[in-house]
């Protein structure tokens, strides 16, 4: 029967091998609240061990987008899983939730155990760094759905926060300040444009881009995980709103965390722009304003705090080895929910 299934495009033995290869990676992400092990029909997590009075569950799901295509084309699969984790846990973190567990979904033309192991290694690396248990997942072999060598990767994360500590941005008010946490690079958005510019420029991706790092490694630098530094701030500073700067850049994401009646005023000269964005802008002849509508431009996550807490917040983030800047302030509402100052043509 296995041979018949294999002839139809599904190799169950390759699937078994992939599972065996990923077990050691998954195991290092486990938390004491996880019940049982791999292989069940469902994964269980004991919320009572969190010792929360009124726990609110927060969930998020996302993928990596066409950054995957760049990784696949250059046979580099060991960090793309970090991106999948980051895109989900950074999102739920904006509510003040601590990520608890993660599930991944890999769909592929053909299960190649070595490749699946590398993908799951990256997922496990991201989970381990954020103390998030990788409690389940699915690997689907669908030869008629994907071209040879191709796969898609998505994830689902669940976190928890005390109901009284849930952050939704509703109490943001004028006079508060915005703290920006540095990104690690492009993160996981805008890659349809990035790949187009790579192709048009005919750049040698193995050539050095900056400080001994190749173009390829620069473009595939994993999305930064903000969980540990932000939770460290949350323990000592009252946070009013948080934003994960993803697709749509500053213009689409920062207003999502603000109530009616206020405007976020951002000084783009208050933080450095990584060289990779300068390269993209030059190669694509892109207007500066549009760059902030596509990319994170060097700031991957923002916090809104009281002005009196700004220095303390920056100090905590420095202790967490995260570059951070006071990038703006909350003002009375103007015509737009966000205004960027210092933008050069």
From Swiss-Prot:
Pathway: Purine metabolism; IMP biosynthesis via de novo pathway; 5-amino-1-(5-phospho-D-ribosyl)imidazole from N(2)-formyl-N(1)-(5-phospho-D-ribosyl)glycinamide: step 2/2
EC id: 6.3.3.1
InterPro entries registered for this protein in UniProt: PurM-like_C_dom, PurM-like_C_sf, PurM-like_N, PurM-like_N_sf, PurM_cligase
Source lineage: Bacteria, Bacillati, Bacillota, Bacilli, Bacillales
Name of the protein described by the UniProt record: Phosphoribosylformylglycinamidine cyclo-ligase
Superkingdom per UniProt: Bacteria
GO molecular function: ATP binding; phosphoribosylamine-glycine ligase activity; phosphoribosylformylglycinamidine cyclo-ligase activity
Pfam families from the UniProt entry: AIRS (PF00586), AIRS_C (PF02769)
Keyword line: ATP-binding, Cytoplasm, Ligase, Nucleotide-binding, Purine biosynthesis
SUPFAM superfamilies: PurM C-terminal domain-like (SSF56042), PurM N-terminal domain-like (SSF55326)
Catalytic activity: 2-formamido-N(1)-(5-O-phospho-beta-D-ribosyl)acetamidine + ATP = 5-amino-1-(5-phospho-beta-D-ribosyl)imidazole + ADP + phosphate + H(+)
Single GO cellular component term: cytosol
Chain segments annotated as transmembrane: none
Intracellular or extracellular location(s): Cytoplasm
GO biological process: 'de novo' IMP biosynthetic process; adenine biosynthetic process
Family named by the database record: Belongs to the AIR synthase family.
């Amino acid at each position: 029967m296995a041979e018949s299934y294999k002839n139809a495009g599904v190799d169950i033995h390759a699937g078994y091998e992939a599972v065996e290869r990923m077990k050691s990676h998954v195991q290092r992400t486990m938390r004491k609240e996880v019940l049982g092990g791999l292989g069940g029909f469902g994964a269980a997590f004991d919320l009572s061990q969190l010792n929360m009075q009124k726990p609110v569950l927060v969930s998020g799901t996302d993928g990596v987008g066409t950054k995957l295509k760049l990784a696949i084309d250059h046979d580099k699969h060991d960090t793309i899983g970090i991106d999948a984790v980051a895109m989900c846990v950074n999102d739920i973190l904006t509510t003040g939730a601590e990520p608890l567990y993660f599930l991944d979904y890999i769909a592929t033309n053909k299960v190649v155990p070595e490749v699946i192991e590398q993908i799951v290694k990256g997922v496990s690396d991201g989970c381990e760094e954020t103390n998030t248990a990788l409690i389940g997942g699915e690997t689907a072999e669908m030869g008629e759905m994907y071209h040879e060598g191709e796969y898609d990767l998505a994830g689902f994360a669940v976190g928890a926060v005390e109901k009284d500590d849930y952050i939704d941005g509703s109490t943001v008010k004028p006079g508060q300040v915005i703290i920006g946490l540095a990104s690690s690079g492009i993160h996981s958005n805008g890659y349809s444009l990035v790949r187009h510019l790579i192709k048009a420029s005919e750049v040698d991706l193995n050539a050095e881009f900056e400080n001994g790092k190749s173009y390829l490694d620069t473009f595939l630098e994993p999305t930064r995980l903000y969980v540990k530094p932000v939770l460290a701030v949350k323990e000592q500073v009252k946070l009013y709103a948080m934003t994960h700067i993803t697709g749509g850049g500053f213009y689409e994401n920062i207003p999502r965390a603000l109530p009616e009646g206020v405007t976020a005023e951002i000084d783009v000269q208050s933080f450095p722009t990584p060289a990779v964005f300068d390269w993209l802008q030059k190669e694509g002849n892109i207007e500066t304003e549009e760059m902030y509508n596509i990319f994170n431009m060097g700031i991957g996550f923002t916090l809104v705090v009281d002005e009196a807490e700004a220095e303390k917040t920056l100090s905590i983030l420095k202790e967490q080895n995260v570059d951070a800047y006071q990038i703006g302030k909350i003002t009375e509402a103007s015509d737009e929910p966000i205004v960027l100052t210092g933008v050069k043509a």
